[in-house]
Amino acid sequence: YRYPELTLCGNRGYGDGLLSGMVIGLPPVLNFGSEEVKRKWSRSSAGKKFISLAISEAHAGSDVMGLQTTAVKSEDGKEWIINGTKKWITNGTFSDYFTVGCKTEDALLSFSSSADLVSKQSRSRLACMDLQYSAAAGTAFITFDNARAPVGNTLGEEGGGIFVMLSNFNHERWVMCCNSARAQRGMVEECLKWTNQRKAFGKPLNSLAIIRSKLAAMISRAESCQTWLESISYQMCNMSYKQQASKLAGPIAFLKAYSTSCGQETAADAVQIFGGRGITRTGMGRYVEHYHRTIAFDALLGGAEDVLRDLGVRQAMRAMPADAKL
């Protein structure tokens, strides 16, 4: 839970800039890489190198099966030759290496990554993207032009990258849920302090029933997200990585969609409570303004809310007995 505490600094992209690669780019290497790859990364990634997860493309966000970046083996069969583009890649502008999702020659998704995978020196071009939430995250548009990576850096079996990606999404979305729940609790704290301090119509804001109603809704959303998060976290701590991938994808998807949806409602309520200060980038309402301006980003990371809700339902339906009926 150290990562969520960074949300309280008031800069949404600061935590992403520091830790995003470790949270979503490195786990596939440690969980699916060969022993040689893992040994190499355990030495080079200990505070010395940055790595990014490169999956999203201009034409494929939540639809990971629609990736157009290709990986073709070299004539000697020792390297992957990678061509394509990646978009909205967090930490991409300053990363040393990339964990890349691509399609192989047989049109099945494959995943390749390691310290030698696709480096900035391996025929790749980076462009910083101008987003509304923060430049501190180093979000990039990446072009791979005949970039090369050793075949030994493939994560998991060739053609089995879809399992690697989907299982990694669980951890990625869980971290987003941690951030969302903590940020909402931070907004509740700001609003409780402000409504106790601010006077309107000759008395504190929190003496007004309509304000207390908004506070009640904010607290209910924040605490329900936190409680659900702790339940899933307990299950994660008592399951193997493979069990998490097969049993928790649906619940985590539901929680992520729910928590970011709650976050948007909380942001809107917080602005109403702070009034003009809630849309001012400086002063007492600066945290509320920043949260309201950047909350939409959380709803898209790791899969759009509607896509995640559908994923959760499909996971539940898949586990139902074929003869289930009233």
PLM regions with names:
Residues 1-9, 17-19, 32-35, 74, ...:
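Alpha-helical interface subdomain recognition
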Residues 2-8, 113-119, 145-149:
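Short Ser/Thr-interspersed hydrophobic loop/turn segments at strand-loop and sheet-helix junctions
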Residues 4-13, 17, 28-57, 75-78:
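FAD-binding glycine-rich core of flavoenzymes that anchor FAD
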Residues 63-65, 91-96, 135-136:
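Short glycine/proline-enriched turns and hinge-like loops at secondary-structure junctions
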Residues 69-72:
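A structural signal for short hydrophobic beta-strand segments in well-ordered beta-sheet cores
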Residues 78-124:
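A short core secondary-structure module
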Residues 118-150:
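Flexible, small-/acidic-enriched active-site or ligand-binding loops
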Residues 146-164:
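Long, acidic (Asp/Glu-rich), low-complexity accessory segments flanking structured domains
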